[in-house]
């Protein structure tokens, strides 16, 4: 509950400063439930509650992002890193919005990290899959779960820079123009560990990978890339 005070206080202040704005308590309609030992979005319940909360839309709606409540206990929970973008996406999907705008501190997705590649430039359009891949592999423009709710409803996402509002930004949508360039962008993840389990005794043995991934999952380790030799004598 303590970590949610920043969003709750700041959104209330902004609501007071904007004429015609109404503050909504996201704890009343963003609900989570425990799945695999983690608090994850209770999608169906949340979508129904969002529709009920926004039956009458005011001129401006202010909603604190990131925070939620457990569907069963009512205890305050949160949506994790990037939860504010995720909150906006959840609401946009539930209300069948025409598009979702996310204002951040960059001009959009870049072809590469400008701190590493000085000639990197903003990508005008990306598909949902392309954006998800770049996010999963290090591009910290959008929190990956943000993409899924609007992707299902085919709602475009527009990424804009708060400090450069005139910038074109990046549009994420399903139908993008054909691009002659085979590579849209390059992203990377630092601090990655590669583990290889190998041995001739693995060949033809059923359930080896299940045991490997179960051991990692039981220790809270997420695997994002897998490679297995065709001879089945190693998994990385």
Whereabouts are the PLM-identified features?
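Generic beta-strand/beta-sheet core signal
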Residues: 24, 63-65, 103, 144, ...
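Nucleotide/pyrophosphate-binding catalytic subdomain
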Residues: 1-143, 147
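A conserved regulatory-domain signal marking ACT and ACT-like small-molecule sensing domains
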Residues: 168-236
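Surface-exposed amphipathic alpha-helical tracts and adjacent flexible/coil segments at the periphery
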Residues: 142-144, 153, 163-170
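Internal nucleotide-binding/catalytic subdomain
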Residues: 99-101, 156-159, 164-165
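Short, glycine-/Ser/Thr-/acidic-enriched flexible segments
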Residues: 67-68, 84, 96, 107-108, ...
